[in-house]
A protein has these predicted regions:
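Mobile "lid/hinge" segments at catalytic clefts and subdomain interfaces of large enzymes
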Residues: 2, 158-244
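Small-residue-enriched alpha-helical segments and adjacent helix-cap loops
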Residues: 23-27, 49-193, 225
């Protein structure tokens, strides 16, 4: 993680300079959003304060992570800690200097916000009771965590047409909505062997769409090969021009 941390730490002062340009009126809110989202930061309505979003792969937070977020909230007088629908956590009402301090301390303590917004692989979500749920097919948490780490390891390298969401569900209840996300993995058992069903090209929002089932069962130990291949498919074939609602259209037309 040393090399990753060094790279992420080196980005902070450039981000601070962008933030100061925004605060001084030299940069529009939309232009700032285009740059800040990938850093895990968004300007709030006042135009003077900011929100940060922490990556919590599979919705799992260690006691160390939670204590650090609690410490940030107390230190910077944040009244509410917001838990997102993708199992990340947010702090609001921060100054630019506070944001940069959180970035630096978080990186040094391996709590990251990089890539939690913008056109990047977002927080990997998973069934909330993975590992302890009575009716789960098998524990999907290790695989969701591995994918989250895979994305984080090269988070600063991505150039995507749109944000990229990955989800894991541990049974047919599909609590993580793998059938309506960019890339979804559903745990199944076939002939006594553990596999994942793979779903592609779904999404929620104003233009919701169900995913396409790939028709192939994959072995859990091969999960990163498939994640990397499908991420590259998204990069190479996704639509960079039409806009967010249709970014998967060129891909799904070819495979449906």
């Amino acid at each position: 993680m040393k090399n990753l941390n060094e790279i992420l730490l080196s980005e902070i002062e450039d981000f601070r300079a962008l933030g100061n340009k925004f605060l001084s009126g030299e940069m529009s809110k939309m232009d700032f959003k285009g740059a800040s989202g990938g850093m895990g930061v968004y300007a709030e309505r006042s135009g003077k304060t900011f929100m940060v979003r922490f990556r919590m792969p599979a919705g799992i937070a260690t006691l160390k992570d939670l204590k650090l977020i609690y410490d940030f909230a107390n230190r910077y007088k944040v009244e509410n800690i917001h838990i997102t629908t993708r199992q990340a956590m947010q702090l609001h009402g921060l100054t630019l200097d506070e944001v940069c301090n959180i970035m630096k301390e978080g990186i040094n303590k391996e709590l990251y916000i990089r890539g939690s917004g913008g056109n990047y692989p977002r927080n990997v979500s998973a069934s909330p009771l993975s590992g302890v749920e009575k009716n789960e097919v098998f524990n999907i948490s290790p695989y969701a965590l591995a994918v989250g780490q895979h994305f984080l390891n090269k988070i600063y390298t991505y150039k995507l047409p749109r944000k990229f969401k990955v989800a894991f569900s541990s049974n047919e209840k599909d609590e993580s909505h793998v059938t309506a996300t960019d890339l979804g993995f559903l745990a199944v058992i076939e002939n006594g062997v553990q596999y994942f069903k793979v779903y592609l090209g779904g999404g929620m929002g104003n233009n919701s769409r169900l995913s396409i089932e790939s028709g192939q069962l994959i072995k859990p130990e091969d999960i990163l090969y498939h994640v990397e291949a499908l991420t590259q498919l998204f990069i190479n074939e996704g639509d960079y021009e039409i806009g967010r609602a249709h970014v998967w259209t060129p891909v799904t037309r070819r495979i449906s």
